[in-house]
C-alpha cells in the first residue's frame, strides 16, 4: 500500500505541475526540486487493515523557519490558490489509478520512475551508507554497501551528499 499511496500522491502533485520534477523520496515524501510538498504515513494495526495519512501542502505560504527540510506548497509552485476540494478529487482519482496499476502489475515500474536518488550515494539515519540501487516489490530500499547488498524496510534516508 505505501507504493500505491506514493504514486497516487506524486501523480496528484504532477497533475497541477506537469512541468515540474516532482518525485518520491523514499520512504514517504513527495518533493519538488528537493522541497517537500507532501508526506505519507501508512500503518497496519492488524492483518489486512491499513491506515494512510497524507499531508499535502496546498495553499500554505508561510512555514516555520526551524524545519529540518525546505518545504513548498502547490500554491507556491503554481502561483494559484487552489480549491482543496479540487485537490482532493484529483487525489482520489490518482489513488484509484494507482490501485489499477497495482492490479495490472504496472505499479512498481511507475514507482521506480518517480523515485529520486537512484544511483546516488545515500546515508541511512543509522549512519550506514550505500548506493541506492532500487526499490523491491515490497517497497524495501535496495542499497549496495561496502559489505554487500542490503534491503531496508523502514527509516529515513538522506539524499544529501555525504561530507567529504
Enumerate the predicted regions with their spans.
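Long, positively charged amphipathic alpha-helical accessory segments at protein N-termini or as interdomain linkers
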Residues: 3-21, 32-164
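General beta-strand structural signal in soluble alpha/beta enzymes
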Residues: 22-26
Amino acid at each position: 500500500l505505501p507504493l500505491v499511496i506514493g504514486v497516487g500522491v506524486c501523480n496528484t502533485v504532477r497533475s497541477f505541475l506537469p512541468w515540474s520534477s516532482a518525485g518520491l523520496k523514499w520512504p514517504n515524501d513527495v518533493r519538488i526540486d528537493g522541497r517537500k510538498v507532501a508526506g505519507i504515513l501508512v500503518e497496519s494495526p492488524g492483518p489486512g487493515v491499513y491506515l494512510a495519512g497524507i499531508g499535502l501542502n496546498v495553499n500554505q505560504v508561510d512555514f516555520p523557519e526551524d524545519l529540518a527540510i525546505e518545504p513548498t506548497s502547490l500554491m507556491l509552485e503554481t502561483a494559484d490558490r487552489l480549491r482543496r476540494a479540487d485537490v482532493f478529487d484529483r487525489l482520489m482519482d490518482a489513488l484509484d489509478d494507482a490501485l489499477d496499476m497495482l492490479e495490472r502489475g504496472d505499479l512498481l515500474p511507475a514507482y521506480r520512475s518517480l523515485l529520486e536518488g537512484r544511483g546516488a550515494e545515500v546515508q541511512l539515519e543509522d549512519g550506514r551508507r550505500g548506493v541506492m540501487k532500487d526499490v523491491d516489490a515490497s517497497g524495501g530500499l535496495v542499497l549496495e554497501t561496502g559489505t554487500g547488498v542490503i534491503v531496508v524496510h523502514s527509516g529515513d534516508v538522506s539524499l544529501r551528499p555525504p561530507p567529504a
